[in-house]
Amino acid sequence: MTEFGMPTLVELPSLEENARLAAALGLKFVESNMNLPMYQAHRLTRERLAPRNGVYFTLHLDEGLNPFDFNPLVREAYLQTAEHTVRLAAESGVPCVNLHMPEGVHFKLPGRKVYLFDEYREEYRASLLAFRERMARAADGRVTVLVENTCFTRLRGLPEALDTLLESPAFALTYDAGHDACDGFAAAEFYRAREGRVKHVHLHQANETTCHLPLGGGRVDENDWLARAENGGMRVVIEVKSREGLERSVNALRERNAIA
């Protein structure tokens, strides 16, 4: 049976309140967004991350985290942040830590954009390898580091970069269906070809310009990824940003018997 979860909501200012809502909705986990000040790694403890009311936690790293920055001092700060978070997850029984794959800086030239990770591939690859090694050590076989699709239409070297990380069993993939809908489904083929490494789905609706919309119909083929999640044992985060949208989405899933 697929395990469904929710993101921490800005409307609910504590893990405890989010866990209570998750339990009331019949969800199994809460994904803690580490952009929020109260969910920074230094404020989280094993006790705070312990399951409650039948609900456990996963972690979503700061969306601005860039462990591939060309500045070594900046890169090291990001690496230490990710390392600390993954170790905390391992010590706390948190099964996975999610990472937005950063696209880095780009320069605008006449008629095109040059992404520096594409232009300076040797430096980029070296930082990918260092990140892979350090996260694998921190995970210690107890945590999966999940890499989420964010920039398939922009960063040409992204598929190769993801495959480099996937050479380590410490890494797997998060497929964000709404992000991909806004990207013209540019990531779908890559993720389907590596479906055995997709362990997590961020499911939400989208239109041409906006994602994180409630479930119940739209550009995203919800049934397709619900079936893939069921067959592949993937977790599914109902990644909408408001309580009202979350409740609507859970009701939409119940109507099709996707969730108990």
What residues fall within each predicted segment?
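Alpha-helix-loop-beta-strand connector modules within alpha/beta enzyme cores
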Residues: 47-64, 126-138, 168, 223-228
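Short, glycine/acidic-enriched loop or turn micro-motifs at the edges of active sites
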Residues: 34, 63, 151-152, 179, ...
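Histidine-acidic metal/acid-base catalytic patches
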Residues: 1-3, 12-24, 83-95, 99, ...
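Active-site acidic/histidine proton-transfer and metal-coordination neighborhood
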Residues: 71-172
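N-terminal pre-domain/capping segments
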Residues: 1-90, 172, 259-260
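Active-site flanking residues adjacent to catalytic metal/cofactor-binding acidic residues
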Residues: 30, 59, 147-148, 175-176, ...
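Short, histidine-centered active-site or binding-site loop motifs used for metal coordination
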Residues: 61-65, 103, 205-207
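Conserved residues at beta->alpha junctions
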Residues: 9, 149, 240
